Swiss-Prot record:
GO terms for cellular component: extracellular region. Its main location: secreted. The gene is sgp. The keyword Chloroplast does not apply. Disulfide bonds: none annotated. It is found in: Secreted. Residues 27-104 are annotated as: 4 X 22 AA approximate tandem repeats. Residues 1-26 form the signal peptide. The lineage of its organism: Eukaryota, Metazoa, Chordata, Craniata, Vertebrata. Keywords: Repeat, Secreted, Signal. The keyword GTP-binding does not apply. Residues 166-213 have a biased composition (Basic residues). Residues 162-213 are annotated as: Disordered. It comes from Xenopus laevis. This is Skin granule protein. It comes from the Eukaryota.
C-alpha cells in the first residue's frame, strides 16, 4: 500500500519531467491542478489541431476545447448553474492564463513549465484571467461571479482591462496626429505659441520681445 502511495506521489514529478522533455521537442505541455481530492488536468498538444483541457470542479467536469488553426478558440466554464464563456483571439503572440489558488499563484502560458498544486479540502480559485499580447480578450470587461458548486469551489472570472491602439495606449478618434492637443513629438506636432518676429512680436516668458532692425 505504501509503495502504491509513493508511486502516486511521483506522478506529478513525472509529468513535469515529461514536460521538460516535450518542450525540447515542441510536442506537448501538461499541467495538473489538484483541487481537494479530485485532479484537474490540463493537456495541450502543440503539434496537433486542438488542445483539450478538462477541469473537474466539485462534481461537474469543465471542458475546454481550442482549435489552433482558427482565429479564436472558445472556452466554456460550467460552474454551478451558470456558464462562463471566455473568448481569446489567437492571432497574438502569447495568450496568458493566471490561476490564483488560495495563497499560491499558478501562471500558465506557452513555454512555461508545468506546475502541480496539491491542496487539502476545498480549493478556492479566485481569478481566471485570459489575455493576449496583441489582441483584446473580449469587448466586455468586468467580473463574473457564480455560485460555488457542491464541491465547495468558488470561481470568479475577471477579464483583463485591455488598452488598444498604437503602443498599447487607449486612443480616441481625435483626427490626425498633428491635431491632437496633447500629443508631443516631431515637427509641427507641438502646440506652437505665436511668438517671435514672424508672428508680430508679443511676450515670451514674461519679457517683452523686440524686433531686430
Amino acid at each position: 500500500m505504501e509503495t502504491m502511495y509513493h508511486r502516486f506521489l511521483c506522478i506529478p514529478f513525472l509529468l513535469i519531467l515529461g514536460l521538460a522533455q516535450g518542450q525540447s521537442k515542441g510536442l506537448q505541455t501538461v499541467t495538473t491542478f489538484r483541487t481537494g481530492l479530485k485532479p484537474i488536468d490540463v493537456t495541450a498538444i502543440r503539434t496537433g489541431l486542438q488542445p483539450i483541457a478538462t477541469f473537474h470542479t466539485g462534481q461537474k467536469p469543465i471542458d475546454v476545447t481550442a482549435i489552433r488553426t482558427g482565429l479564436q478558440p472558445i472556452a466554456t466554464f460550467h460552474t454551478g448553474l451558470q456558464p462562463v464563456d471566455v473568448t481569446a483571439i489567437r492571432t497574438g503572440l502569447q495568450p496568458i492564463a493566471t490561476f490564483q489558488t488560495g495563497v499560491q499563484r499558478v501562471s500558465t502560458f506557452h513555454g512555461e513549465p508545468a506546475s502541480t498544486l496539491q491542496g487539502s479540502g476545498s480549493t478556492v480559485i479566485k481569478k481566471i484571467m485570459v489575455s493576449s499580447m496583441n489582441q483584446p480578450v473580449s469587448k466586455n470587461e468586468g467580473i463574473v461571479e457564480v455560485p460555488p458548486p457542491s464541491g465547495g469551489t468558488h470561481v470568479i472570472t475577471e477579464e483583463m482591462n485591455w488598452h488598444g491602439g498604437r503602443n498599447g495606449h487607449k486612443m480616441k478618434k481625435l483626427g490626425k496626429k498633428k491635431h491632437h492637443k496633447n500629443r508631443h513629438g516631431g515637427k509641427n506636432h507641438h502646440k506652437m505659441k505665436k511668438i517671435g518676429k514672424h508672428h508680430g512680436g508679443g511676450r515670451k516668458f514674461g519679457k517683452k520681445h523686440r524686433h531686430h532692425k
